[in-house]
């Protein structure tokens, strides 16, 4: 029981930090028409939503989220100077119970199911549910800004505006960790669908496209190592591509490969 209580305290702290980081990032990007999304990966579906025969109740993470979001607004609202943003936050449409949702596996009857026993099969069935709202999630007219998922969303979801990833679980599977962290490694887009890359932002591309991982210690160590590995891998890459880069670089041509691209 003590262990469970201590873990709940840790998870609540992670949720709180994710919300605060989200609000600060959202404050910075709101006027530029860039919607900020946060993604939570959870251990079991019933940690977020508990299904009865004909009803569904909020799980502990959903309750924690709404409590901590309301608390964060009370603490931070007076520090926000952008009146358009404060009106956005105060809009009843953006009340705590409306801004989060869970995307999980679904059975043939369209009901959410616990996927821990048939993880691969059920995650695959859940991808379609996530993809249906992919573009709508990027609009401020959609109140959902916080997403809870059981799966790693590996090849089924590619939303560019995930700025925070919070892992409310522990795992030693490094492949799955890479899949989860990879959900936030995208160049964001604004409300016009314009990708915020170096052509648009110049050097500020690095100030805008920042991913924050709020994690337990195992994920924190992993994220730092991944960042180091990526920095080392990119260090030797040329900043500008010129003709001299390809001097004396001869490579065999694969006609099978070319045909594959043409078809």
Where are these regions (language model features)?
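Short secondary-structure boundary/capping segments
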Residues: 52-60, 163-169, 180-184, 226-232
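Short, glycine/acidic-rich hinge or "gate" loops at secondary-structure transitions
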Residues: 31-36, 79-88, 193-205, 232, ...
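Phosphate/oxyanion-binding loops and surfaces in catalytic or ligand/nucleic-acid-binding neighborhoods
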Residues: 68-72, 183, 187, 233
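Intrinsically disordered, low-complexity intracellular terminal segments
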Residues: 238-255
């Amino acid at each position: 029981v003590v262990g469970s209580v201590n873990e709940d305290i840790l998870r609540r702290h992670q949720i709180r930090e994710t919300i605060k980081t989200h609000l600060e990032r959202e404050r910075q990007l709101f006027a530029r028409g860039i919607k900020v999304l946060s993604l939570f990966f959870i251990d079991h579906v019933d940690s977020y939503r508990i299904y009865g025969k004909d009803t569904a109740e909020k799980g502990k993470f959903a309750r924690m989220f709404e409590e901590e979001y309301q608390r964060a607004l009370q603490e931070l609202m007076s520090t926000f100077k952008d009146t358009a943003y404060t009106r956005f936050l105060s809009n009843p449409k953006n009340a705590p119970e409306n801004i989060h949702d869970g995307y999980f596996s679904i059975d043939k009857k369209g009901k959410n199911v616990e996927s821990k026993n048939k993880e691969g099969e059920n995650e695959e069935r859940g991808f379609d549910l996530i993809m249906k709202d992919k573009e709508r999630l990027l609009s401020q007219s959609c109140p959902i800004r916080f997403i809870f998922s059981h799966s790693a969303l590996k090849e089924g979801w590619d939303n560019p505006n995930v700025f925070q990833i919070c892992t409310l679980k522990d795992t030693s599977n490094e492949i799955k960790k890479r899949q989860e962290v990879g959900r936030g490694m995208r160049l964001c887009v604004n409300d016009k669908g314009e990708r915020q890359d170096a052509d648009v932002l110049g050097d500020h591309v690095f100030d805008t496209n920042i991913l924050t991982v709020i994690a337990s210690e195992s994920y924190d160590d992993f994220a730092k190592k991944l960042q180091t590995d990526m920095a080392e891998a990119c260090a030797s890459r040329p900043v500008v591509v010129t003709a001299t880069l390809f001097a004396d670089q001869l490579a065999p041509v694969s006609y099978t490969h070319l045909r594959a691209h043409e078809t």
